[in-house]
Amino acid sequence: MSIIKKIINYSPNFNLKKRNLKQIKFIIFHYTGMKKEKDAIKKLTSLQSEVSSHYLVKNNGDIVVMVPDLYVAWHAGKSSWKNLRSLNINSIGIEISNPGHDHNYKSFSKKQILSILKLSKFLKKKYNIISKNFLGHSDIAPFRKK
């Protein structure tokens, strides 16, 4: 099943050591928080930013692969959930293009929502992720994110 358009814009911001895919237990949603989508892509693919995600859902609904699932992307940062710390290792990060609260927050587009649903269902099935393990960045880093 291929729901991802062949758009690949790899980020250099991930651990080179491959992980055991059975470790993946969470999906973490983020919004880019930048005025322009192209600036968000530039940041996510810049070595200096030290931030990335596995996927980016663009305004038009396209899904961009930023870091292959086999690698640990740097998206969760200093994070915790229940008894776990540093959730990068056991999660998939999905960035959603959106200016966020600091830049005139906008509702997600219908195309984005449909793509997010398709990608979420695909990843849930692929990695056997339970529904309560779909989280927002603000859930795992409440003092750093709104």
Identify the meaning behind each predicted range.
Residues 2-128, 132:
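Active-site-adjacent loop/helix surface patches within enzyme catalytic domains
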Residues 127-144:
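Acidic/histidine-rich, metal-coordinating catalytic segments
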